[in-house]
Amino acid sequence: MFGHNYIDFWASSKSSEVNFHPAILEAHHSDINLIAITADRPARLRKTGANQTTDQVGIYKLIKTHDLASEIDLKPLFTGKPIHLNIQFSEPLISEERNDWLAGIKIDPVEYKSGVGGKLETSKGVLIIGHDNAGYTSDEINTFASKLKWPVIAENPLSYPQSHPYAALYLADPKVRQALAPENVIVIGRTTLSRSINEFIKLAKNLIVIDPRVADVDNNRQANLLLQSLPSDVSSELTTIDIWQKSSELASAEVKKLTWSEQAAINCICDCLTSMSALFVGSSRPVRDIEAFTKFENKIL
């Protein structure tokens, strides 16, 4: 996660903007605040035979394009969704003024409103945190988890001290899944890394999903209860973690027996990180290795 303010990227040529499609697809599905800014020639030159007049309006079908030919207030456009700004430039492209046009510019930081609030009443269960955190910070989710008093499974175990490591491994055993099957499961965000955890979720009698995206991007998501905000007032029953701790201990003993492998390598990397490190992890296999084979490290940023 880059944070809660918008991240922008630019393209100035007529072909380079097509390379933004993968990032925009990811931003759309993850509901990330992303701005694609493309430079364009004036609209009057379109379809006239002029060079560099590829029609860039609506080139990214999943997000809205704002075709801009003059100065406007951009703030109303930033609604918490990825957007495309297509900027028309007319000649002269370089001002004849010799003043430093950046002098005196002041950027006011945008405060993030987290969408935390509301009340949740439930009994016993298990909390499962998807790798994307549903857009919440780990601090916000850790606060919620401490109020809930349930066992915690996290697809990103490095950020959650109370999460039970190696859950994706031992939940792959159908007998273990059945033995640990809960009455309630709360899922924060999307669980997309592990089939075993998703099979475990299916065993719950009552499923609660917390994710702001159920309002629009994921409006067909199914659960007994869909919440668009992380509850701040939580009433629940303490759920024992003894069997979860024992399962993690047994799995840990087996993991330590691993000879050199990619799983051993990712553990070695995590062990060598210094305090407050930022760890960037590729998709597919590497992020799944972290989910299944590592445990909380308080030095991971």
Residue positions per predicted region:
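Thiamine diphosphate
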Residues: 1-43, 287-301
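Glycine-rich phosphate/diphosphate-binding loops that line cofactor/substrate pockets in enzymes
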Residues: 1-5, 75-79, 116-125, 144, ...
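Conserved thiamine diphosphate
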Residues: 4, 40-44, 48-82, 242
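Glycine-rich, anion-gripping cofactor-binding loops and their flanking helix/strand elements
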Residues: 12, 129-208, 216, 296-301
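Conformationally flexible catalytic loops at phosphate/diphosphate-handling active centers
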Residues: 76-122
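A short, well-structured juxtamembrane/interface segment
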Residues: 111-121, 136-138, 176-179, 256-272, ...
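Phosphate/pyrophosphate-binding active-site segments
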Residues: 201-287
